[in-house]
Amino acid sequence: MACPWQFLFKIKSQKVDLATELDINNNVGKFYQPPSSPVTQDDPKRHSPGKHGNESPQPLTGTVKTSPESLSKLDAPPSACPRHVRIKNWGSGVTFQDTLHQKAKGDLSCKSKSCLASIMNPKSLTIGPRDKPTPPDELLPQAIEFVNQYYGSFKEAKIEEHLARVEAVTKEIETTGTYQLTGDELIFATKQAWRNAPRCIGRIQWSNLQVFDARSCSTAQEMFEHICRHVRYATNNGNIRSAITVFPQRSDGKHDFRVWNAQLIRYAGYQMPDGSIRGDPANVEFTQLCIDLGWKPKYGRFDVLPLVLQADGRDPELFEIPPDLVLEVPMEHPRYEWFRELELKWYALPAVANMLLEVGGLEFPGCPFNGWYMGTEVGVRDFCDAQRYNILEEVGRRMGLETHKVASLWKDRAVVEINVAVLHSFQKQNVTIMDHHSAAESFMKYMQNEYRSRGGCPADWIWLVPPISGSITPVFHQEMLNYVLSPFYYYQVEPWKTHVWQDERRRPQRREIRFKVLVKAVFFASVLMHKAMASRVRATILFATETGRSETLAQDLGALFSCAFNPKVLCMDQYQLSHLEEEQLLLVVTSTFGNGDSPGNGEKLKKSLLMLKELTNTFRYAVFGLGSSMYPQFCAFAHDIDQKLSQLGASQLAPTGEGDELSGQEEAFRSWAVQTFKAACETFDVSGKHHIEIPKLYTSNVTWDPQHYRLVQDSEPLDLNKALSSMHAKHVFTMRLKSQQNLQSPKSSRTTLLVELSCEGSQAPSYLPGEHLGVFPCNQPALVQGILERVVDGPAPHQPVRLETLCENGSYWVKDKRLPPCSLSQALTYFLDITTPPTQLLLRKLAQLATEEAEKQRLETLCQPSDYNKWKFTNSPTFLEVLEEFPSLRVSASFLLSQLPILKPRYYSISSSRDLTPTEIHLTVAVLTYRTRDGQGPLHHGVCSTWLSSLKPQDPVPCFVRSASGFQLPEDRSRPCILIGPGTGIAPFRSFWQQRLHEAEHKGLQGGRMTLVFGCRRPEEDHLYWEEMLEMARKGVLHEVHTAYSRLPDQPKVYVQDILRQRLAGEVLRVLHEEQGHLYVCGDVRMARDVARTLKQLMATALSLNEEQVEDYFFQLKNQKRYHEDIFGAVFPYEVKKDGAAGLPSNPRAPGAHRS
C-alpha cells in the first residue's frame, strides 16, 4: 500500500519576507486564532474556512513516524512571514498582500514575451477528453491534498477522522484506481470551486450554493429528470437560488456524463438561406447540431433549445424542456413605450452547463450550475454585442441619436437605456437580477473578506470589470492576481467535436474537421487564394466622401470586382500619386462638396493630380460621382478627375457615372458598376468571364411582387417625434409656432417669412450661431387625400397598420423597419415623399400596375433616360399627378408604404442667437410656389415653406439641430469678418449680429470689425431686415453695411460680387491677408461661385499671384477655416430654365438651406 504520509507531511523550507509595512490582511507576523463562535452541523457555512480555509494543514518537519498528538501542530502558523505579492487599489490606495497564490495549481498560459490573459478559453483553463483513467500515482497526492484541505476547513481539528479518511482514500485508490467523495466532501468541493473561480464577480454568495448529488444516475432520462428538478428549484418563480447538479465522475474517459448545451436554457440561432441569422447567432452551430439530431426548428427569434444529454459515454439524446419550467422576461423600458415593439425577452435562469469540476484529481464533466444575472450580461453582451442580437443601432435610431457619428456617443447612450430596460423588466416581473455597480461593490467586499480570511483571492481583471461603466466601478481600479486553485471549474472541448459515435446513422451530417487538419486546410486555401489573387489584374478603388456614402459604395464595388480581379479599396488621402505609374485598373467613387469642390479627404489628391503634367503609364479607369442635381456643379469633382486622367493619357473603361441623391442614386450606381465590371472583364480578357456569379446586391429583382408584402392591423398609437427620430437617426424635438412675419413689402409678388418658434420647455435646445435647424414638414392635405382616393384594396385611411415583408425563403413574415406602425393617411402626411418626381425604377414598377396596355407602354418608355429627363423636367410631377396622368394604375397601400421614398427634412440656417432669445429659434424662409410646363402647368408649392406658412400659433413643428462647425463665428472675436449673403442668405448672419449684440450689451465684449454685404432686388420691395441692419450699424455691431440692388429702374444690375469689386477690394485684402480675418458666404450656389471668382481676381491682382498660386491661396484659407461657405442650390424653376445649359437642377423643389 502506498504511504499517504509522504503527501501529508511534506518538508517545506520557509523563506523570511522582511516586509515591514502592514496591509489590510492584518496578518503579517501574527498568529492564527480560529473564530470562537460555534457553527452547527446544519449551518450552510459549516465548511466556511478560517484564516487558512483553503490551505492544507501545515506539515510537520521531521520523521514520518509521529504520534497522533503531533497532528495538533497542523494548525500552527509558519515561523516567519510567508512570501507575498502586494496588490493595490489605485482608487482607494488600499493594498493587499497575497500569499494564497503559493497554493496555485500549475501554471497559467502567460509566457515571458507575451501575455495571454485576454484569451477566451486558454489551455491552462481547459481540460480535454481522456481515453484512460488517471494513474494512481498522479491521483493519490491530489486526493490527499484535497482531504487535507477539507479537514483544514473545520473550526476545530478532527485529527482522528482526518487520518482515517486519508487511510481510506489511499486504500480505495490502491484497490480500484480511483475513489469516491463523500456527500459532505462533494458539497465542500463545489462551493470551494465557486469560491476559487477567478472570472466570477458574484462569489460573495459562494457558501449558499445548493448541491444536488446526481452521481447515482445512469441514463440520459435520469439526467433530464435531475436537470428539471434543478431548474424548478433554481427558478423559484423568479426568486433565483444558486444551485449545482453533479453527475457521475469521469472514469476512463469513455463513459462520461455530459450536458452538450453551453447553458441549460438558451435560444436557437438559425442560419437562413440568404446568409442572415435569425435568433441568437452564438448558438448557430449548436442549433444545427440539434436539427441534425432530429429536433424540429421553429425559426423564431427566441426558441428555447432542447437539452442534449450524454450518459455513460453513449450517444446523446434530445429532450425538450417543458415550457412551464422556462421563466422568461419580456423587455420594456420605463420611459420608451416603443421598446416593447422590439419584441425582446430573455430567460431568467443563467445556468452554465458545459464546464468541468476538478477536485482532488477527480473530474466531473457534467455539473450544470447557476447563479443569477448581472444586468449587463443581458443588456450589453446578449443584446448589444455585434455577434449576438445586435440591437444597439436600432435602439439608437429609435432614440433619435446620431448613429452615423461615432463621436456623438450614441452607442454609450443607447446601451445605458437598454440596460435600464433590462433591469426594469426583471424587477417588474420580480425576477432576481443585480446591476453591475452593486455587483462590483459586492465583489470588493468579498475580496476584502477573502484577503482577511485566507490571504488571497484569485481574480481575472479582464472578466470582472463590467462591460460598461469601466472606471466608475471600483473593480476597475483594483490590481488583481490571477491563479488556479483546486477545486476548480474548467472549460471543456465541445463534446460533438470529440464524441465517438456508437450509432453512425445518428452522426450529424456536417462532420467537424480536426483542428490540425483545419489549420492545414485553411493555410493551403489561403496560399491558393493568394496565388490566385496575385495572378489577377490589380484594381485600385479610390473614394472621397463627406458623409461616408462614397466609402460604402466603394466597398460594394470592391466586393463586385473581387469576383474576377484583385481589388484594393483606399481613401484618396491614403493614396500616393506616384502609384499611378503602376496601376492597371483605377476606379474612383467620389462625391462633390460645396461649389464643385472635392470632399475634404480628396483635396490632397485633387491638388496633386491637377498639378501632374505627364504620365507614362496608360492604365484603364472609370469614375462614378455622387451628388445632388439641385447644385449646378453636379458631380463636378468626379468629372474633373475623369477629364484630368484622360488628359494624362489614361483610357476610360466606361462612361463616368452619376448618382443623384434626388433621383435613384443606388440604382444608377449598380447599373454603372455592373457595366464597368463587364467592360473590365472584356478588356482584360478575364477567364470564364461569361460564367462569373456576381454578388446578389447587383442582381436584385427590380420588379414589384405584391406577395412579398402585407399589412397587419396595429393598435400602437403614433408618437411622431419618436418615429421621426428612429427613421432619421436624429434627436427630434417639438417647437411651436410663435409668430410669422412677411419680410417682403406688399408690393412684392414673393413671400419671405421670419418664422419664430418657441420651445415647449424653459429653454430652447442648444445651438450655435450659424447652425441649421432641420424641419420635418407635412405634405399638403389635398395631395394626401387625392392619393388616398385612388388606393385599391386599402385599409381605412385612419386605421393603424404595420407593413410586413416575407423573408426570402418564404417561411415567415418580419416587420418592415422603414416605417413605424401608422395609418396610411399618417404615412402619406408625415413620412413619405409624394412631391418628388418618381425615379425610373419606381416608374418601372408602376408599369406593372397599369391595366391599360398603352399606359403600361408609356411608363416603360419613360424608364429610358432621354424620355425620362424630358418628362421630368417639363412636368416635375407629384405622385398624385402621375396617378392622374395614368388613371389605369391600380396602386395598393402596401405598394405605397414599401416603394415611395422617405420624406426628408428641410434645413434652414438659424436666424437667432440662443443667448439673446433663449426660448426661441428664428428661421428665414422663402415661400416657394411655381407652375410647371412653362407656366401653363399646375401650381406647385414648396413642401416645407408652404407648410410653415400655413401654420397657426402654437402649432407643433418637429425639428432637430444640425451642427455646422465650418460656419461659426471666429473663436477669437477680435478678428474682422466680412459677411456676404444676398436674399435669404442673410439668415445665418442675423444670428451672428444678435450674438455680437448680446456679448456687447450683457458681457461687455467688443468684437472685431463686421462688414455686411447684402443683395436684393429693390429697397422698397425685398430688403430683408433693413431696420434691424440699421439698428446694428447704429450700435456698432455692424461696422459697414453694403447693399447690391439688382432691379432698380433705369439702373444697371448690381450684385454682391460687384460690391466687392467696386467698394471693398481694400477691405478684402486687409481682412483676409493682413489681419488674418474671416470671410463668410451664404446663399445660392451660383452666387457663391461668382463671389469666389471675384475674390480670387482681387487677391491675384493685389498680391501678384498667378492662377495656380491664387488657387493655392484660397485652398489654404479653407484649410485654416477662414473662408466659410454655406450654400444651397437654385430652387426656382425660371432660374433652372434660364441656366439650364449650365447644368442647373431639374428638381425645383429640392431642399435648400433656406428655401424649400
Swiss-Prot record:
Region annotation Calmodulin-binding: where it falls in the sequence: 515-535
Cross-referenced InterPro entries: CysJ-like_FAD-binding, FAD-bd_FR_type, Flavdoxin-like, Flavodoxin/NO_synth, Flavoprot_Pyr_Nucl_cyt_Rdtase, Flavoprotein-like_sf, FNR_nucleotide-bd, NADPH_Cyt_P450_Rdtase_alpha
Regulation: Regulated by calcium/calmodulin.
Residues involved in (6R)-L-erythro-5,6,7,8-tetrahydrobiopterin binding: 118, 381, 462-463, 476
Amino acids binding NADP(+): 750, 929, 984, 1017, 1046-1047, 1053, 1055, 1057, 1090
Phosphotyrosine PTM positions: 575
Gene Ontology molecular function: any one: FMN binding
Family: Belongs to the NOS family.
Name of the protein: Nitric oxide synthase, inducible
